[in-house]
């Protein structure tokens, strides 16, 4: 189906048919909703029931009905469900064995804290969090409730996007990243399966299980993101800062243009070779920044001149130029050339990317300059605790959220007429989601990803 731009420099739309999960950003009075739907607060807040979902048992509040599995990963299982209180479809993620070890427990705590703090239209936020257990001693399950979205970027990448849609999707990615960076949060796991969209072209970034608050130490484990989207400084163990996420955006943008992964390495060595074959061997100045053993290996690899960006991304790969004089192949290619830079010191920043001509046609100060999230646990990534201590911290977070819900305020709102997901309709029988904490594209290696259900998408088009 051919795509066309509905309104000149208005927000474009997508016609997508897959359900995915994301977050809410509004508030609504629980007591009002409970009254509206003839539900008492006790029924809304306190009654649970159990249902078998695949190989797992979900014990959820009775407000959540018609559970259907839509994804699984190392950190949990995701179900689609109907929320009778908010009168809309939602996604429920059950964390998988969050207290199995210190790493799992710390990751669960970090994900929960960051999701509760972040509040931006292009980033996931929690609608609800609960546990069926009533005491700390019994506590073992954590459920996160989020909005159900229409598709992830894996499906969208395979479509023929015009410049308006491509530019607008990239703009929203950058807005979300800037919001995280404003609080010193590095995402580190940006990839198509962790970015979701609605048919109105709204985009949201998923997953904070691997996000990190920026601190004094940047020498972190390199195994933090699906290999194909890992920045060179991660591959080479150099340590990294915020613009590590910009490389990932560049890889995603390049994949939108080529409809295939840019650097599909089998391992770190092959990944590095794929990068330098296309972009060229970096200069001696960059080599000096490497650790001696890594530098010795890199300097002894064959030298590549690399290809020019017009050869890497010729005009024939891009859609026809837009009527807008900034949305054309030459500008898109220029942005790619600034993001896909091996040396992070020379790579474009998120602020400069938002000001790039291919992106700034959408610039809205309210979206770009939104107040940074208030991370109340400043030592989030420096904390070290026993499993029992992590468990107690998570339990307190869950109890705090449940108390706020009982007091009458929860995130979310009933679906308006004409919403992207019509809650009056039944849930899709075979929808698919990439788990917001650990899932990735089909082409990744088994060591980097977990299983996901079969995904399919309808054609992209314009929704009225």
From Swiss-Prot:
Subcellular localization: Cytoplasm; Membrane; Nucleus; Mitochondrion
Phosphotyrosine: modified positions: 223
Stretches the record annotates as Disordered: 405-464
Biological processes annotated in GO: cellular senescence; Fc-epsilon receptor signaling pathway; JNK cascade; protein phosphorylation; regulation of circadian rhythm; response to light stimulus; rhythmic process; signal transduction
Domain Protein kinase: 64-359
UniProtKB keywords: ATP-binding, Biological rhythms, Chromosomal rearrangement, Cytoplasm, Epilepsy, Intellectual disability, Kinase, Lipoprotein, Membrane, Mitochondrion, Nucleotide-binding, Nucleus, Palmitate, Phosphoprotein, Serine/threonine-protein kinase, Transferase
PTM annotation, UniProt: Dually phosphorylated on Thr-221 and Tyr-223 by MAP2K4 and MAP2K7, which activates the enzyme. MAP2K7 shows a strong preference for Thr-221 while MAP2K4 phosphorylates Tyr-223 preferentially. Weakly autophosphorylated on threonine and tyrosine residues in vitro.
Tissue/organ expression: Specific to a subset of neurons in the nervous system. Present in the hippocampus and areas, cerebellum, striatum, brain stem, and weakly in the spinal cord. Very weak expression in testis and kidney.
Catalytic activity: L-seryl-[protein] + ATP = O-phospho-L-seryl-[protein] + ADP + H(+); L-threonyl-[protein] + ATP = O-phospho-L-threonyl-[protein] + ADP + H(+)
Cofactor: Mg(2+)
Modified positions (Phosphothreonine) in chain numbering: 221
UniProt feature, compositional bias: Polar residues: 433-454
Enzyme class: transferase
Family membership: Belongs to the protein kinase superfamily. CMGC Ser/Thr protein kinase family. MAP kinase subfamily.
Protein name listed in UniProt: Mitogen-activated protein kinase 10
Organism name: Homo sapiens (Human)
